[in-house]
Each structure stands twice: as C-alpha cells, then as structure tokens.
Amino acid sequence: MLGLYAAYGLLDFVRLRLLVRIASRLYRNLHQRAFAISVLLPLKAGREADRLNPLRDLDHLRGFLSGSGPTVIFDAPWIPFYLLVIYLLHPSLGALATIGALAVVALTAVAEIFGRGPARLTSEAMISQRALAESGRRNAEVVHAMGLSSRLAGRWSDIVHSYLAHQERLSDIIGGTGSLSKALRMALQSSVLGLGAYLVIGGEASPGVIIASSILLGRALAPVDAAIANWKGFLATRHSYFQLKAMLDSFEDPVEPLELPRPQTRLTVERLTVAPPGTPKPTVLDVSFQLSSGAGMAIVGPSGSGKTTLVRALVGAWKPLNGKVRLDGAPLDQWAPHSLGAHIGYLPQDVELFDGTVADNISRFGGKSDPKGVLAAARAAGVYSMIMHLPEGFQTRIGEGGRALSAGQRQLIGLARALYGEPFLVVLDEPNSNLDVEGDAALAGAILAVRQRGGIVIVVAHRPSALTNIDQVLVLANGMVRSFGSREEVLSSMTRPPVPATHRPIIPTQRGVSGHA
C-alpha cells in the first residue's frame, strides 16, 4: 500500500513538472508575437487598445497552466470510472454516489453562470486602475503643478470601489458555491457510510465495501472540488485565452515579401484617404503629390487639418482607407517592416524615447555594431556637443520616455534617431517646437544635408524657421490639399490680399488637388 501511495505521489510530481514545462514552452513560442502585437495595437485598434494587453493575457495562461488548475482536466474523465466501480460494489451505493456527484457538478455550473459577469467586470475595472495609474505617473509634473492629485485620487477611489464591489460579488459566488459543495460532499460521504453500514447489517455487502466506497467517492469528487476552488482563476484565464486568440488571429504573421532595393528616386502619394485607427471618419481626403530625390516639402495648415494624420500614413504607421504611398513605385505594404524602417526616418510630434542609453536610442537599438553611424547621426542633427556634456556621453541612460532630458534635448536626440543610417525619406512632425535658435540652425542644416545626399525631407511646420531649406509647400485644410507648389508661390498666395467678392472670378470647385515635383 505504501508503494502505491509513493507511486501516486511520484506520478503527480511528474505531471506538475510536465505542466510547468508545457507552460514555459507556450510562453517561449508566443512571447515575441505577443510583444509585437502589443506594440502594434495602438496603430490598429485605436482607443480600444487601452483595454487589451496580450502580454498580460499570455502570462495569465502560463500561470494557470503551471499551477494546479489543469490537473482538474486530467482527473475529471475518471469520475465516471470511480462511480462505476462504486456501482459494482453495490447498485444502491452507486446510485447515491451518482446523484451526489451530479449535485456537486450542478453547483459548479451555478458558479460558472453567475460568476461570468462579475469576472468580466472585475477584469475591466483592474485594467482601468492600471491605465489611470500609468497615466498619472507619466504626467506627474502636470498632476503636481496643477493640483490634480486629489481629483485623480477621487477618480482612482471610484474605480477601486467598483473593482472591489465586483471582486467581492465574484468571491461571494465562488465562496458560496464552494461552501455548499463542501457541505454537500460531507453529507454525501456520511450518507455513503451510513448506507454501507445498513447494507452490511442486512448482509447485502461486506464491511470492506464501506471503506472502498468512501475512498472511491472521495476520488470521484476531488476534481469537482478542485474546479470550484480554482474557478476564479479559470474564469480569468478563459477570458485571457479568448482575448489572446482573437488578437493572434487578427495579427497573423505577414508573409515576408521579396527584399526590394533601396529607394533612390521618388515618393509618390496617390489619392490617399486616411482615418485614425478605430474610427471610420477620415481626416485626410484624396491627397496626391509626388516628390523627387533631393526635394524638401513643408506641410502647413491650421490645427486639425490632418497634417499629423498624413505623415503617419506616409511612414506606414497608419494604414490608409484608400490610396497608396509608394517609394520608387513600390507600395509601402510591399516592403518588409524591418527593411522599410531602414529607409525611413521619423520624428513624431510627441518624441518618445526608450529606456536605454543615448546611443541605443539614436541607433534604434542597433548601435553596438555601428558606432560610426551613431556618431554620424549625432553630428548630422547638431547634437554631438550636447551629448558630450551629458554625465556619460553617449552611454548616459535617459530613463523611460527620456525623462532625464529636457524637451529640447529629447527632440534633438529624436532627430538624430530619424537621421541614423541616412534613410531616403525623412519625415519630421513639428521638429522645432521645443528648439532654441541653435536648435533651429541645427535642424536647418540637417534638412539641407538630407537633400544634398539625395534624400527627401517632409516637415510639418508651424513656425517659419522650419521652412528654411525647404523648396516646396503643401497646404492642408479640412484634410484636403488646398495648394501645392514651390515655397515662394504658395507662401505668396497665402499672404496675397483676397479679391473682393464683386470682382472675384468664378472658379469651379475641385477636390483632390494634386501636384508634381
């Protein structure tokens, strides 16, 4: 008997080790895809991305699989076998055990039906908690300077109260069904013992039947008890599984396209219509133009005219609803992402740097193999001297988001990152919003250098200093091109006094104005 128990313990230990290895293998196989999806989610799902976290869902799956929860799945198929053996010992004992087991299973179904809603609401409240905490931490300066701490704390308190209310309700449901299950199991085992004793007294069974039926009933009900005990984790894991599966299905691994040659001649935009991710209403409508190598173009227009939307589509960050962006005739979606990234330099309106060194950020985390490229990009952006004055130069760690740097320093390092590797297309969204006079001069020099080496520069401009070394201007209004041409022509037309209404010639309205360099 001791040998059997030892064998049982050894097999259970082996099973748990196998589950841990399976969970680790699943994580190793999916963690890169989950990370890639988490990075791309804001570009695909828009605001919906705030509640999605594939890495968290994958971690939930790994944690559940490496725990005791999955053992229920392996033990549950043995329940009918144990009940059958009890029935063979005596039909009356088998009938009683079967009725009791069905009652315990019914309690599990009750926990599933009534616990599903609170589990979902608990998960949503937890996501809201994390989002608010991250937002407050990211905007700590604004929170402190404008006295928002108490208001954010009040909002946090509301979310926490909601979370705790849903959590308490879920715990009450799981705990209540668990307590009922435990009471029912004790009553059932007592009933089996009593019925067995009655059968023994009546000469219908041997005394050993009492012990055997009690042990077998305990083994039959063990998976159900374990299921109820782990039900809260099971509900969360099931939610994570379906959510992760939906994201993996939506973000299928792209087919690696043929490696295309480095672009050298032109950028072509054909009837481009773009909407922010997750919204059906376009903010850029029917935009067309073409730029040749060596060109420098500024995009100007009032706030909300679609300038940032347009440049996000030009670099491939946002997918257009209609139209194409082409480099040397090839649409952006025909380029492998890593290859396309090497040919594009992008400085967004809100400069986001990563936790790492200055060199890591400039080199797009590939600088250990190309230190000369890092130095060249820093000099091209006019930021070399500033970096040399940092505590550890290029090896200075800048913290998440570049919090160790000023806004102007972040912008210049972001410019150096955009220039790293001498990309063919350089897109700068309000690159001088935080720059001083020296920074403006460095920006103008960088734009000229890109044009002189045969690249194309596109600048979203609000300040006149950003138009230095720019030869063409595209004017956007309400998402449509209002004017496109040489800088002198467009700027003079923008400053020309309007023609009085009584003398203004009637000109047919045209949409989708396009120009060619």
PLM regions with names:
Residues 148, 172, 220-247:
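Cytosolic ends of transmembrane helices, especially the final helix of ABC transmembrane type-1 domains
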Residues 2-12, 100-103, 174, 178-188, ...:
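Hydrophobic alpha-helical segments in the permease module
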Residues 1-12, 71-122, 194-205, 222:
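Transmembrane helices of ABC transporter permease
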Residues 24-25, 32-58, 132-155, 230, ...:
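Short intracellular "coupling" helices and adjacent cytoplasmic loop segments at the cytosolic face
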Residues 315:
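Helix-to-loop junction immediately C-terminal to a conserved catalytic motif
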Residues 334, 359-400, 444-445, 449, ...:
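ABC ATPase nucleotide-binding domain helical subdomain, centered on the C-loop/LSGGQ "ABC signature"
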Residues 43-44, 57-65, 69, 117-118, ...:
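An intracellular "coupling" helix at the cytosolic face of ABC transporter transmembrane type-1 domains
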Residues 421, 453:
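Conserved signature/switch motifs of ABC ATPase nucleotide-binding domains
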